[in-house]
Each structure stands twice: as C-alpha cells, then as structure tokens.
Amino acid sequence: VHWEQGFGDIIQFCRYLPLIKSLDAPPAKLFFDCPDKLIPLFTDWDCLDEIADFGDTPPEVDYFIPLMSLPGRLGTTLETIPAAMPYLVNPLSDYFEVPPLAGTTLKVGIVWASDHGASYRRKVCPIAEIANLFDMKHIAFYGLQFGEDARELDSYTARENVHSLANDLGGFDHTAAIIEQMDVVLSIDTYIVHLAGAMNIPAWIMLPYTPDWRWFLDRSDTPWYPGSRLFRQQAPGDWASVIDTIRPELEVLIAQNR
C-alpha cells in the first residue's frame, strides 16, 4: 500500500490497513510505503510486516494499491466506515507535560491556518476571530499552530490563559503527545484534526462555506471521527458566526469540568 496526498489523508485512511490483514484470504505480507515523518505513529501496528519510505525502490510485491483507493475496493459505505477509536495512540507518553495555566480547568488546543498552498486562503480562520474566545474564564488556550503562522499568537500570549506550544510540537509523535493532553482541539481543516480524531481526542473542526468532500454537507457530526464535531460557515468567509456557535458549546464543557 503506498501513500498519496497529504499527511491528513494518510492519517485518515490508514485505518484501512488492519482490515487488509484481517481479510479472509491467503496469508500475505503487508508493506506500507509511508512518509518518514509519519512512521513513528505506526511503531506498534502489528498488521504491518514492513513500513518505510520506499521512494523509488519499493519491495517486490504481487499487488499494490494507493492508500485512498482502499475504501472503494473494500466497498465502504457511510454505515461501514471503520470508526473504532482510537486507532492511533501517543507513542511518546513521557515526552512533554503541557504547562498548566492558573485558574483554568479546560485545555483547548487551537490551530487557525493550513499549509500555504492553493487552498490556503479558504482554510484560514484569522487568529483575531479565535481571540474573541480568549476572555472565557476557566479555559487554557494552547497554540498548536505550525509554521510561520504560529507567530500570530505572540500578540496574545501576555494573557494568563494563552500559551504557544509551537516550539514543542517537533515531529508527529511529539505533536501526538501534546494533543493527548488536550480536552478539545479547535482547528481549521488540517492534519491536526485527523491526528486528534484518530486518537479519539475531540476535534472541533471549523469549516469554510464550501468544505472539503470528506466533511459532506448539512451535518455537524462526522462518521470518520465520531467524537469530533463540525462547525460550518453560514456564508463564504464568515468565521464570526462559527466562533459565535463555538462559544456556548465551550461554556457547556466548562460547566461539565468544574
């Protein structure tokens, strides 16, 4: 099985790898061609006989298939999406303890921008919009933003309940260790929500008016990650209504955690 598309796609569809191994078929070895950066997430996957970034020298095999073609070949429907969670676990349980912030009971990780690509403008919620939540009591907001956009949080870290973890994210295994300590990950559509969802950490996904295909339309849940929720723009570019919808939902969590 060889990877394709981006990191989020790989994390979302790797759930199908154990299904291949469990098929009622002659015994076979399963090789997974995976980007080096993601390999630490699969160290305990017994279904894989070999995992590597094979590049231009793949092993000799009898069959091969792109990762994202597996749902079609296995006849997946909305009702049969493999949704047992978690299917990824934190491989670095002793890596890093997220610093507690005084007076808070709820840890919320925030991500507001995707990689700078063709869909960048559509997949960015201005940090100023998310900052409208920073006045909420009892919530610690932790910046999980990667890349150059992480610096945008610097204007808000003087607040006692806002802290950037950009310098601690490291590799995907380090990021997983941090995500595991969050109560909620509030993020635009990027690989972070797939990593959180696969670990069964609630991802609250902020979606543009015209979302990616995997999130469907007219629903606030997702069959891919049963513990996660979708918050959709009501008009193109309207992130304010998304934040307005999220605020009372956070208040419910605060009440439950006090």
Residue locations for each model-derived region?
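Catalytic machinery of carbohydrate-active enzymes
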Residues: V1-R258
